[in-house]
From Swiss-Prot:
One of its GO terms (molecular function) is GTP binding. Belongs to the TRAFAC class TrmE-Era-EngA-EngB-Septin-like GTPase superfamily. EngA (Der) GTPase family. Residues 355-439 form the KH-like domain. InterPro entries: AAA+_ATPase, G_ENGA, GTP-bd, GTPase_Der, KH_dom-like, KH_dom-like_a/b, P-loop_NTPase, Small_GTP-bd. This is GTPase Der. GTP 2 binds at residues 187-194, 234-238, 299-302. Associates with the 50S ribosomal subunit. The keyword Nucleotide-binding applies. It comes from Herminiimonas arsenicoxydans. Residues 3-167, 181-354 form the EngA-type G domain. The gene is der. CDD domains: EngA1 (cd01894), EngA2 (cd01895).
Length: 447
């Protein structure tokens, strides 16, 4: 499980600046939740070999009772509940404010690990910029400049150390799970995720209802279907209570992102009775960016008129056309209709994502592609593609070597991707193409 860091503080203390630095400006990978003026943003960062999720919150008024500030406070409280570590940011130039004290009182009651961070400390001595903030009783403050990056690496390293130290040791995964397909079912609330889980498990092991609270605990449910082993990764907030699993249809962005990152295959479930939303597209975008194999399921298909079915298909093509590599199935989780073929596509997507592609076959496919259509010249230079090899799995990565490959445009790269897909039957998985140019023997070099 990736640790979760929440950035909290009053308005304009530098939360978004720090967020953009931690995520290298890839903010809002799964963008704003609907219906709110200012929502929390989620992004993914990495420190060395340690990935993490980071939440950027709006300005925080813990005691706000109504209006925009009340909604923002709710969002921030949810972010704190989802976090392993809270980075509480204050403004070193403005000094301590009553607002900072109010936020401190809330954070102390939350039970979360809190790191006090003094931002905007450029050119100021540590003792001078931190003196006021000891009054908050949160220990020695960390001093950073989010704008310039000073002190940020040390801050993140320390926060990750805290996050990992307070987590229970992970249990050893049984050998049977190692051979299973790790499946995450994701989607907006009430699209039928828990009903589909019930159908897949073949018994009423999951109870679907809304519960308050968070969905921070990760669980895995092993199951077998037609002789194949799967491990269902919690996405809808499935929690163990005694021997029963409860599915909380309370949408958790953190849970969704973590589940996607831990899966071999992601099943994106949509609701045929509703139009495809911006939130659906954002989730799909994150799945694509994560490189996970994908199957799309359109649930509640039974009982729809032919006109409505046509509308949905047009909507799919228009809003989720970038998922054309994935199989789409029209199903009814409640009536178990279409589930078998959909799970077959899960198997096929997994097989495609884990394909072992030999260098001779990849190179032969590359030569065939170039013979069919050569890349365009860029000025007087025509790129030369010489050979290809596999650079990774899940998703498959095809590394192409040659000369002047930086002259290849996006259209030709898409052509190559399509050719490799068709040649190797890579359905249901993203495919990455990497271009590596050798040195041009005719270019000038330093003697």
């Amino acid at each position: 499980m990736k640790p979760v860091i929440a950035l909290v503080g009053r308005p304009n203390v530098g939360k978004s600046t720090l967020f953009n630095r931690l995520t290298r400006s890839r903010d809002a990978l799964v963008a704003d939740l609907p219906g709110l003026t200012r929502d929390r943003h989620y992004g993914e960062g990495r420190m060395g070999e340690r990935p993490f999720l980071v939440i950027d919150t709006g300005g925080f008024e813990p005691v706000a009772k109504e209006g925009i500030m009340h909604e923002m406070a709710k969002q921030t409280k949810q972010a704190v509940a989802e976090a392993d570590v809270v980075i509480f940011i204050v403004d070193g130039r403005q000094g301590l404010t009553p607002h900072d004290k109010t936020i401190t009182d809330f954070l102390r009651k939350s039970g979360r690990s809190v790191m006090l961070v003094v931002n905007k400390a450029e050119g100021m001595k540590y003792t001078m910029v931190t003196a006021d903030f000891y009054e908050l009783g949160l220990g020695d403050p960390y001093v950073i400049s989010a704008a310039h990056g000073d002190g940020v690496s040390d801050l993140v390293e320390e926060s990750l150390d805290i996050a990992f130290a307070q987590r229970p040791p992970e249990e050893e995964v049984p050998e049977s799970k190692d051979r299973s397909i790790r499946l995450a079912i994701v989607g907006r609330p009430n699209v039928g995720k828990s009903t589909l889980v019930n159908t897949l498990l073949g018994e009423e092991r999951v109870i679907a209802f809304d519960l308050p609270g968070t969905t921070r605990d990760s669980i895995e449910i092993p199951f077998e279907r037609e002789g194949k082993l799967y491990t269902l990764i919690d996405t809808a907030g499935i929690r163990r209570r005694g021997k029963v699993f409860e599915a909380i249809e309370k949408f958790s962005v953190v849970k969704t992102l973590q589940s996607i990152s831990e899966a071999n295959v992601v099943l994106l479930l949509l609701d045929a009775q509703q139009d495809i939303s911006e939130q659906d597209a954002h989730i799909a975008g994150f799945i694509l960016e994560s490189g996970r194999a994908l199957v799309v399921g359109v649930n509640k298909w039974d009982g729809l008129t032919s006109d409505r079915r046509d509308e949905i298909k047009i909507d799919l093509e228009r809003k989720l056309g970038f998922l054309s590599f994935a199989k789409t199935h029209f199903v009814s989780a409640l009536k178990s209709s279409g589930i078998g073929p959909m799970m077959k596509s899960v198997d096929n997507a997994y097989a495609a994502a884990m394909s072992n592609l030999s260098t001779p076959k990849l190179t032969r496919a590359l030569i065939e592609a170039v013979e069919h259509q050569q890349p365009r010249r860029k000025g007087s230079i025509r790129p030369k593609l010489r050979y290809a090899h596999q650079g990774g799995m899940n998703p498959p990565i095809v590394v192409i070597h040659g000369n002047a490959l930086d002259a290849i445009d996006a259209n030709y790269k898409r052509f190559l991707e399509k050719h490799f897909r068709e040649t190797f039957s890579l359905v249901g998985t993203p495919l990455r193409i990497e271009l590596r140019s050798g040195k041009n023997p005719f270019s000038r070099s330093e003697k």
